[in-house]
C-alpha cells in the first residue's frame, strides 16, 4: 500500500501541524482553567464584601431603631403632643386658623418643607422632624403675635420722645429678638419679656429634637443604602462563582458496531 504523499514528495508528511494543534489546545485549556479560577476567587471576594455591607446595613438599622425608640420615649415622658379636632385637623388653642398661621410661618417664612404625613392625628406624640419644627414655630408664632405689658415708674425720654410714667401695652408685632430697639424705654423691656430665656431654651431644645429626628431619617436611609449595595454585590459575587464553576464532562456515548457474520 502506498504511503500518502507529503508536501515534499512521497511518504508521510511531518506531523508538525498535528503536534502544534495539540499543544495549542493544552495551552488554551490551561488559560481557561486559570481564568475560571480567578473569576471564582473574584466572585468569593465580592460575596464577602456583599455580606459585609449587609451586616453594616443591619447594624445601622438596629442603632437607628434604638435612637427612634429613645426619642419616642423622651417625647412621651414630656407629654409633648400636637392637638387635632374631631375631623383630624390640626388645631392650636382649639382653632384651625391658629394652626394654619403657624404652618404658614413654618413653610413660607422659614422655608421648611413640612411632610404632611408626619402630622398624623392617630399619633399626636411629637417624634418627627416636621412635628418638632411645628412646635418650634408655635412658640415663635405666639411670641411674635403677643403683647407685653411694660411699666415705667418714672418718665423716660428717647430720641426726642418723652414717655410718661405708667403702664403700656407694647405689641411684639411679629418681631424677632434682634429686631427690637433695646435702648427704647418700651421696646427694650418688651423684648426681654417676649423673648425670654424660657422661649429661647424651648426653641433650642426643639431644635435639637429636629436634628435628632432628621439624623434618624438619614440613618434609615443609610441602612437601606448599605443593604441594597450589599445585596447587589452579593448576588454579583455568587453569580460569578456559579458562572465559573467547572463544566461537567459527560462520557461519550458508545455505539455498537455491527460485526460481519462469518460465512
List each language-model region with its residue ranges.
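Short, aromatic-rich amphipathic segments at membrane interfaces
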Residues: 174-228
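Membrane-helix exit/juxtamembrane interface segments
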Residues: 55-94
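Hydrophobic secretory-pathway targeting helix
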Residues: 2-70, 228, 235, 241, ...
Amino acid at each position: 500500500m502506498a504511503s500518502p504523499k507529503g508536501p515534499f514528495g512521497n511518504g508521510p508528511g511531518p506531523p508538525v501541524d498535528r503536534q502544534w494543534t495539540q499543544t495549542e489546545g493544552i495551552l488554551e485549556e490551561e488559560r481557561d482553567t486559570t481564568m475560571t479560577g480567578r473569576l471564582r476567587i473574584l466572585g468569593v471576594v465580592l460575596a464577602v464584601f456583599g455580606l459585609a455591607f449587609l451586616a453594616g446595613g443591619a447594624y445601622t438599622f438596629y442603632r437607628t431603631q434604638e435612637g427612634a425608640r429613645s426619642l419616642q420615649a423622651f417625647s412621651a415622658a414630656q407629654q409633648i403632643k400636637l392637638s387635632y379636632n374631631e375631623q383630624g385637623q390640626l388645631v392650636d388653642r382649639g382653632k384651625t386658623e391658629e394652626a394654619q398661621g403657624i404652618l404658614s410661618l413654618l413653610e413660607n417664612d422659614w422655608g421648611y418643607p413640612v411632610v404632611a404625613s408626619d402630622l398624623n392625628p392617630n399619633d399626636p406624640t411629637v417624634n418627627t422632624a416636621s412635628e418638632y419644627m411645628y412646635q418650634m414655630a408655635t412658640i415663635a408664632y405666639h411670641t411674635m403675635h403677643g403683647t407685653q405689658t411694660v411699666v415705667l415708674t418714672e418718665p423716660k425720654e428717647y430720641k426726642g420722645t418723652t414717655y410718661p410714667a405708667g403702664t403700656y401695652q407694647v405689641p411684639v408685632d411679629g418681631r424677632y429678638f434682634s429686631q427690637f430697639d433695646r435702648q427704647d424705654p418700651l421696646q427694650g423691656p418688651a423684648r426681654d419679656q417676649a423673648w425670654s430665656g424660657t422661649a429661647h431654651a424651648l426653641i433650642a431644645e426643639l431644635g435639637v429634637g429636629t436634628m435628632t429626628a432628621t439624623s434618624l431619617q438619614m440613618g434609615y436611609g443609610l441602612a437601606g443604602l448599605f443593604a441594597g449595595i450589599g445585596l447587589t454585590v452579593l448576588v454579583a459575587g455568587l453569580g460569578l462563582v456559579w458562572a465559573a464553576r467547572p463544566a461537567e464532562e459527560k462520557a461519550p456515548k458508545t455505539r455498537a458496531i455491527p460485526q460481519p457474520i462469518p460465512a
